Amino acid sequence: MITLSIRYRIDHNKLRDFEAYARSLTEPIRRCGGDLIGYFLPTRYAGPTNEALALINFPNLAAYEHYREALAKDPEGTASVAQVESSGCIVCEDRGFLQKIS
């Protein structure tokens, strides 16, 4: 099992746009083979207000590669990406993989 970690730097004035994006991808991610742990927004209590996180599990790297291909062809997924790009709420994103150890 591997976990895709996507760290987003977001425009903190557009949190609602990012939240709508995250909610719109729940079904496309599942449909395309990802096991969504969740999308996470910053709180007002501590830490940066312009960082968000997504965590998605896959059985292996081949499953992730299949997911990427399927998501690129998914009409709902591509519409969500187009909407978030036009909103400008994501400043940048970094992807990496994590392995659960306990």
Where are these regions (language model features)?
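Absolute protein N-terminus
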Residues: 1-2, 102
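Active-site-flanking beta-strand signature of metal-NTP-handling nucleotidyl enzymes
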Residues: 2-8, 53
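Short beta-strand-to-loop capping motifs
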Residues: 8-12, 56-60
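Short, surface-exposed ligand-recognition loops at beta-strand->loop->(often short) alpha-helix junctions
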Residues: 10-20
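An amphipathic, aromatic/His-enriched active-site/gating alpha helix that lines ligand/cofactor pockets
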Residues: 20-37, 57-95
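A short beta-turn/loop motif at secondary-structure boundaries
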Residues: 42-48, 85-88
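A structure-centric signal for secondary-structure junctions around beta-strands
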Residues: 49-51, 92
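Edge beta-strand at a domain terminus
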Residues: 97-100
